[in-house]
Amino acid sequence: MSGLLSSLSSAAQSMDAQRYGMDVTGQNIANLNTEGYVRRRLELAERQIVAGVGGVEVVGVRATRDQFVDQRMRTELPAESRDSAMSSALAVIETSLGSTGQSIDGALSNLFKAFSNLSSDPQSAVSRDGVVLQGTRVAVAFNEMAQRLDDSAHQADNDMRASVEQINTLTKSIAKLNQQIGDAPTNADIAPLKDKLDIALQNLSKITNIGVIMHPNGTADVAVASGHPLVVGKFSYDLNITNAPVTGVAEVRTSDGTDITATLDSGSLGGQRAVRDTLVPGYQQQLDQLAYDFATAVNTVSQSGFDLNGNTGPLLYLPLATVQGAAAQLKFNPALATNTSLIAASSTGAPGDNGTARALAALQNQDKARGNTATFVESWSELVNKVGTDSANARDSLATRHEVVSAIQGLRDSVSGVSLDEEAGKLLQFQRAYEANAKYFSTINSTLDVLMAALGGL
């Protein structure tokens, strides 16, 4: 009798275990498309036979997580996000430069054509109006291009400020999850909390490079690349934004006031800083140098000539004090717009002479830019090519990084992801085991009924 009762108990426990397995499998299938979900696995063990009772016992439910793969993902994501931020910003800058012949190069060509027309008829009011019109358009083209580059730097600065806010939001979330995990009862299911923690850490690593220390209880401590803590246990430490004294751009400081801006070289925050502090300033310097070289060359020739009244030629462009900011400050002399007779076309002062107009037109093909090694259009093309090359390199690097991240994600999915085929097989396995144990239970129960009936008849 006791043996049958033991078998009945063993069958019931096994049925419970198989039903639990079906529940776990169903949970996996339900979360097939849930971001950050890690596949659960039911762990069973043989129950030691004691007093004739054996069978199976549920050890627990384990999340199939590989900490090494998770760490590798957090290592690669910052580089991918950095390239993504740079690629996006450079695509905008590349577009803002305009197409060949429709930007600064086109404006310069039209001005030199106006100088050529003036040389054909130095006293023509129409030709002089053409110089004013095209000269003004060149200045406007430089001004607008300088503004576009400044807008790109300003956008990158705003993006940095937003990224710091996102970092602070995520670190607060991580600290809260640490507290929930640490306060959870010993046998509580904290797998969902760990999933949320992993998502938060992954999202944080997209913004900036972080160091993560995982503790045995499942909590995580986080620090930025400089070593300054962001999360320690249930406490989070905000990054703060201050404005640089001269430029007013964002500086990133830790909770103790340390400026870590220069160390932010990875993640989307690192890409935004590279755009703001390195790429755009480099383009601005090239553009400013071109504007300065152009204005200097044109003004020098103009001042060597004479206007219609026989007076020394004027500045075609208002004087520029320094190279820095030249593109934004370039302005056609407004006095010439109100009195075109002041435009110098003659090199001798004699009526009908066109020496200065010809000299101005000839500047188009002279190496007066980039330290007298390139023409103005060639210098502009060099800037366009530089932006194009940087943009292409960022795209290529992003593609390479994406392949690496995709490969790691594939490895991660093979370990932690949910496979419908695999789960369907497990579901069938648990179902059949349940049915077999149910049949075993029914058989033992029937045998007991027969035995009890027999004993009752004695």
Regions found by a protein language model. Name each.
Residues 1-458:
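S/T-rich, low-complexity, solvent-exposed segments of bacterial secretion/appendage proteins
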